[in-house]
């Protein structure tokens, strides 16, 4: 899954290791969901999904590359720092994208916020008292 390793490097090389695992998990879990392409390469390079992938490839140290590979391996064996069903994230260093309003925030690791589909238990309804 070298495309996922590149994604972790481009999207989260400056983040804590646990956030790198969560970023890798997003890509790997999308492969299993019919809403996204069914290969890691297809997910990682899908248009308008991961802004870091549209950026020019930066230079990374051997240690950064090995750490990213370990993060991808950790996600492959099932480690999910934010739980299952996390398909979106963004860096909190930018303004929250509009798509976050329709999702449920599950966790924040480093400066990355991770989101899942809203579940019925996430919705709070307020009924007027008559």
Regions inferred by a protein language model and the residue ranges of each:
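Bacterial extracytoplasmic/cell-wall-associated proteins, especially those involved in peptidoglycan
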Residues: 1-130
């Amino acid at each position: 899954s070298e495309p996922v390793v590149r994604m972790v490097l481009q999207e989260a090389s400056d983040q804590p290791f646990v956030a790198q695992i969560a970023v890798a998990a997003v890509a790997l879990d999308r492969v299993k969901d019919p809403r996204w392409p069914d290969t890691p390469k297809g997910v990682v390079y899908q248009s308008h999904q991961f802004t870091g992938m549209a950026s020019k490839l930066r230079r990374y140290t051997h240690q950064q590359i090995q750490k990213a590979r370990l993060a991808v391996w950790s996600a492959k064996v099932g480690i999910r720092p934010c739980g299952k069903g996390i398909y979106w994230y963004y860096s909190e260093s930018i303004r929250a994208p509009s798509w976050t309003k329709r999702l449920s925030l599950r966790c924040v690791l480093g400066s990355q916020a991770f989101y899942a589909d809203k579940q019925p238990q996430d919705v709070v309804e307020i009924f007027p008292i008559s």
